[in-house]
A protein has these predicted regions:
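Hinge/cleft segment of the Venus flytrap/periplasmic-binding protein
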Residues: 24-26, 158, 166, 276-337
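Short, solvent-exposed amphipathic alpha-helices that sit
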Residues: 39-53, 132-139, 165-185, 203, ...
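Short beta-strand elements in bilobed, periplasmic/extracellular small-molecule ligand-binding domains
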Residues: 53-64, 154-157, 175-197
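Short beta-strand elements at the ligand-binding edges of bilobed clamshell
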Residues: 63, 117-142, 157-159, 190, ...
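Flexible loop/hinge segments that line or gate small-molecule binding clefts
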Residues: 93-131, 256-265
Length: 337
């Protein structure tokens, strides 16, 4: 009898402990295309810190290693590793669909970063690249017309002409920005530089040989800009004189410490770059997941919900170098002066 009473007391004490046990933290898979990239390192680090502080959630990096197949395989690991949610960065959307749909059926919250994921309808977090691309195009056109009012504008872009989001976020709005200043500007179009900086270098060499009149260049990623500027230098171009263009004006994407040296060099023709902020991006990707969890955003819809987050126009003319240094130090944790 005493044993039965003792057992009853023990059980009575245990039940409230079980009932009031702390809930398990939400586990979030945070996909990046390449964790060796400083932007992706910084946005993951911020997402991890932000999710823990604001939501008590745990964030885990899923590195795509710049390999489309690895990115797709990582989707299977979302289920295998018991994740509650995932924010995806995928290159092959069609290949990813089966894994995404399987995860959705298991009640896992799925979102995408940069591009809507095929017709899955999962919400997408995107950077507002179009606004900054337009601004850079307009500013470059104004500066060229100021320096050379009688020289017609001839522009070219190097990037990903067949990538929907790059076209809508970078190429097209840049062209519109230029045309808003000079409706008669000539556009040579977007050249396919998807194979990297070496191919980009040859493309630019060919362009300036065949069209020496080209004077506005949008190099649509910082790695491509390495090839762009190398080509211009080899061709005897890429020059400014104390802040005034001599041969052309170049803008880029993915502003970083390396690009800052050229942007604020009064004798380099690289004068603007789109700053993609890892802090706002990392936080935005987490907030989108939590908005789905709270019911503010539907898990799927047609068309997919798209949330846009701020980008920055880092410009020799409109952003003082001290502000650019502060931006880099804040966003990337550098200690520049």
């Amino acid at each position: 009898m005493k044993k039965a009473v003792l057992l009853f007391i023990v059980l009575a004490l245990l039940v409230p402990m079980v009932a009031f046990a702390a809930p398990q933290p939400l586990k979030i898979a945070f996909f990046v295309s390449d964790l060796s990239n400083v932007f992706h390192q910084a946005q993951f680090a911020e997402a991890q810190k932000y999710a823990k502080a604001k939501y008590g959630a745990e964030v885990f990096a899923f590195d795509g290693k710049s390999d489309s197949a690895v990115m797709t395989q990582n989707i299977d690991q979302v289920v295998a590793q018991g994740m509650d949610a995932a924010t995806l960065h995928i290159w092959d959307q069609e290949a990813a669909k089966p894994g995404v749909n399987a995860a959705l059926k298991k009640g896992i919250i799925m979102t995408s970063f940069f591009s809507p994921l095929a017709d899955t309808g999962i919400p997408t977090a995107r950077s507002d690249e179009a606004g900054t691309s337009f601004a850079m195009g307009a500013e470059m056109a104004k500066q060229w017309k100021k320096a050379f009012p009688n020289k017609p504008i001839v522009m070219v872009q190097v990037g990903w002409p067949n990538h929907t989001e790059v076209k809508s976020g970078r190429t097209d709005p840049f062209v519109k920005g230029v045309l808003s200043v000079d409706p008669k500007a000539t556009n040579l179009g977007c050249q396919d530089s998807s194979k990297g900086p070496d191919v980009t270098k040859q493309i630019i060499l060919d362009v300036v040989t065949q069209h020496p009149e080209v004077n506005l260049i949008y190099s649509e990623a910082s790695n491509l800009t390495v090839g762009t500027m190398a080509a211009l230098t080899q061709a005897g171009r890429g020059k400014f004189a104390n802040g005034k263009p001599l041969t052309e004006i170049v803008c880029s994407v993915d502003f970083d410490e390396v690009e800052m040296k050229s942007v604020y060099d009064p004798n380099s023709s690289l004068k603007l770059s789109m700053g993609l902020p890892p802090l706002e991006t990392g936080r935005g990707r987490i907030d989108l997941i939590m908005d789905i969890k709270s019911g503010k955003v539907k898990p799927t819809s047609q068309p997919a919900v798209e949330k846009f987050y701020k980008t920055y126009n880092i410009s020799y003319w409109t952003m003082p170098r001290a502000d650019a240094v502060k931006w880099l130090n804040t966003q990337f944790g550098t200690s520049l002066k």
